[in-house]
Regions:
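C-terminal motif of bacterial Sec signal peptides marking the signal peptidase cleavage site
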Residues: 13-16
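Beta-strand-rich domains and repeat architectures in extracellular enzymes and scaffolds
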Residues: 48-84
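Asp-box/WD-like beta-propeller blade repeats and closely related beta-sheet repeat scaffolds
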Residues: 113, 131-178
Length: 195
């Protein structure tokens, strides 16, 4: 009987003993960052202030994006005081207002909301991205071409151009597979690949 009690006690002691594997501490690299003052002239050879035209048709309230293409500066801006409507305005290199591209509404060529725009001079196009899964295409003169539904309806935030003219869109809401960047054909808005 004492042997049985001894074996039970021994098995209890053995089962309660755990070996924890040794964990090696990772190497810690210490990086010392030195702040170095940088001058604007380190990046630009010339800085020129260009006052933009101010009239009732082209008042800027909150600037969201600035895109420069050729001699034209495109500014994506929200209206004041509601900050609900977003407009893309074009100015020449002297700051003169040229036109607005697209507008808020329910009709053809009108959008409910856009978050970003990109300009392709090679294609004579302006692509405006709606967060609701649509892309609006206009000519550089502001005339409407079409509206395309994007492959997946996601919370689209930004749009850009690749060197070969395809479009890249970024979404804040990842799909289940983690992809949040889509590469699209600029003409058809068909999905090429996603990352």
């Amino acid at each position: 009987m004492s042997h049985i009690l001894f074996l039970v006690a021994l098995s209890f002691v053995c089962s309660s003993c755990n070996r924890t594997p040794s964990v090696e501490e990772p190497d810690v690299l210490k990086v010392e960052l030195k702040e170095t003052p940088v001058s604007v002239s380190d990046f630009f050879s010339k800085v020129e202030v260009i006052p933009l035209e101010t009239s009732d048709s082209c008042l800027l309230a909150r600037i969201l994006r600035v895109r420069v293409s050729g001699d034209t500066t495109y500014i994506l801006t929200q209206d004041y005081p509601t900050f609900r409507h977003i407009t893309l305005m074009a100015f020449d290199k002297k700051g003169n207002y040229l036109r607005s591209i697209g507008r808020v509404g329910q009709g053809p060529g009108e959008y409910s909301q856009v978050y970003d725009a990109v300009i392709s001079e090679q294609r004579n196009r302006v692509y405006m991205l709606s967060p609701f899964g649509s892309m609006y295409t206009y000519r550089l003169d502001g005339s409407f071409i079409d509206r395309k539904i994007l492959p997946q309806k996601m919370n689209f935030q930004e749009i850009g151009l690749t060197p070969d003219g395809d479009l890249l869109t970024w979404s804040a809401q990842n799909k289940d597979d983690g992809a949040c960047i889509m590469r699209l054909d600029a003409d058809s808005a068909k999905l090429i690949n996603e990352f």
